[in-house]
């Protein structure tokens, strides 16, 4: 495998690792190269991103590498955040939102155990839409972030309090929480 292909694969690995980032050891294992070689490639890629007219940079914090946006573009990102969007939430985001609404405060890991898949993207979407927020930290190893719904969540779905959420009766416990939640909300909106 040539250097260009290695960089392409590393770029993809950085992307899919998201905010958690990736260790050079992981890259070395995936590419079946020495760790020093992985670090050299990452450093080359950092320089290429800095020198080029690109919107992303590769940053390193505590031995972890990840993509980050450039500070000089921050005003444009803020405009995007401030721009109302008509885009609806994905099914994954809706399922995650229902889990948070009924089980809050809840950690990302607990959500992933319920859904059976990663929730990183859905969480980012829900936080950016101000429907959920960090509510604190759980006790225990790593002190994971606890998530809960926001006032904007209540406003968006026409709820005064969380007590207005459709109840989970025994017959509905087997039903998908997202389907139940949004089915009941459709009844409320009629």
UniProtKB/Swiss-Prot annotation:
Keywords recorded for this protein, A-Z: Cell cycle, Cell division, Chromosome partition, Cytoplasm
Cross-referenced HAMAP family: ScpB
Record protein name field: Segregation and condensation protein B
Domain of life: Bacteria
Originating gene: scpB
Family, similarity comment: Belongs to the ScpB family.
Record keyword Disulfide bond present: no
Chief location of this protein within or outside the cell: cytoplasm
Quaternary data: Homodimer. Homodimerization may be required to stabilize the binding of ScpA to the Smc head domains. Component of a cohesin-like complex composed of ScpA, ScpB and the Smc homodimer, in which ScpA and ScpB bind to the head domain of Smc. The presence of the three proteins is required for the association of the complex with DNA.
GO biological process: cell division; chromosome separation; DNA replication
Subcellular location, record wording: Cytoplasm
Purpose of the protein: Participates in chromosomal partition during cell division. May act via the formation of a condensin-like complex containing Smc and ScpA that pull DNA away from mid-cell into both cell halves.
GO cellular component annotations of the record: cytoplasm
Pfam family, one: SMC_ScpB
